[in-house]
Swiss-Prot record:
InterPro entries: Ribosomal_L11_MeTrfase_PrmA, Ribosomal_PrmA_MeTrfase, SAM-dependent_MTases_sf. This is Ribosomal protein L11 methyltransferase. Belongs to the methyltransferase superfamily. PrmA family. GO terms for biological process: methylation. The keyword Ion transport does not apply. It comes from Escherichia coli (strain 55989 / EAEC). HAMAP family: Methyltr_PrmA.
Length: 293
């Protein structure tokens, strides 16, 4: 069914109070959006970090009398009579179907294609990874995933062991296996990611060569010829002592999930253990690669 949304602009400090006010006025859900499209990364545990200039959006049933909603909100001390707002009627959509319709096969490097599992492959002779991300991150559409896939495609992975640290949907580990790796190991803190990776591995016929672990279950002595970690700059810095010991001597490391402005600090965390290559950038993101000393 169609919906009505009411949008308010406020400061991050007042956003939670206005969220409560919208719920009390009958909103069925609340969304926070940055007015200026400024990214927020890596909040502290338990922290809900909001932008300095925040849009608070309440979603209402189409039958709601919005004049009554506005009258209720005018009594709020942060708003008052005649407060600025915007009301829009939203078209009813099958959002899952719309997302699926807009997810098309994508090529990375010379050989590799990532294809939605519900679409035909564009090149039968290419290295095709059939993907259904489910509830986990990783479709290839994000610049960081794209950077990692292009890097993997550029390598000779024949017979190699690959670790995908923070595997999400399993896209990188599965791509490595399809590109010739003998074995891949996926590690993620999210059980849903482990399940999504397992499902995608089965879909691609590589489940017998993919090991999946939550961090608490991973073997103590794990080594690989290639290690790729597409997470975020903060965890990459904090986990550098752990990640740095995973590649064998002479092994390769690929890191992403890093803003270009964060590259220097991440490089510093790995410089003692790796001979690092020049940083590669895509949009505002980057990839760091190197060889183990």
């Amino acid at each position: 069914m169609p919906w009505i949304q009411l949008k308010l602009n406020t400061t991050g400090a007042n956003a939670e109070d206005l969220s409560d006010a919208l719920m009390e006025a009958g909103a069925v859900s609340i969304t926070f959006q940055d007015t200026h499209d400024t990214p927020v990364f890596e909040p502290l545990p338990g922290e809900t970090r909001l932008w300095g200039d925040t849009d608070v959006i309440g979603l209402f049933d189409a039958e709601t009398d919005m004049n009554d909603v506005v009258a209720i909100l005018e009594n709020h001390p942060l708003l008052g009579a005649g407060f600025a707002h915007k009301i829009e009627q939203l078209e009813d959509k099958d959002w899952e179907r719309e997302w699926m319709d807009n997810f098309h096969p994508m090529r990375f490097g010379e050989r590799l294609w990532i294809c939605p599992s519900w679409r035909d492959v564009p090149d039968e002779n290419a290295v095709n990874v059939m993907l259904d991300p489910g509830l986990a991150f990783g479709t290839g559409t994000h610049p960081t995933t794209s950077l990692c896939l292009q890097w993997l495609d550029s390598l000779d992975l024949t017979g190699k062991t690959v670790i995908d640290f923070g595997c999400g949907s399993g896209i990188l580990a599965i791509a490595a296996l399809k590109l010739g790796a003998a074995k891949a190991i996926g590690i993620d803190i999210d059980p849903q990611a482990i399940q999504a990776s397992r499902n995608n591995a089965e879909r691609n016929g590589v489940s017998d060569r993919l090991e999946l672990y939550l961090p608490k279950d991973q073997p103590e002595e794990m080594k690989a010829d290639v290690v790729v970690a597409n997470i975020l700059a903060g965890p990459l810095r904090e986990l550098a002592p752990l990640i740095s010991v995973l590649p064998v001597s002479g092994g390769l490391l690929g890191l992403s999930g890093i803003l270009a402005s964060q590259a220097e600090s991440v490089c510093e965390a790995y410089a003692d253990s790796f001979a690092l290559d020049p940083v590669v950038e895509k949009e505002e993101w980057c990839r760091i690669t190197g060889r183990k000393n």
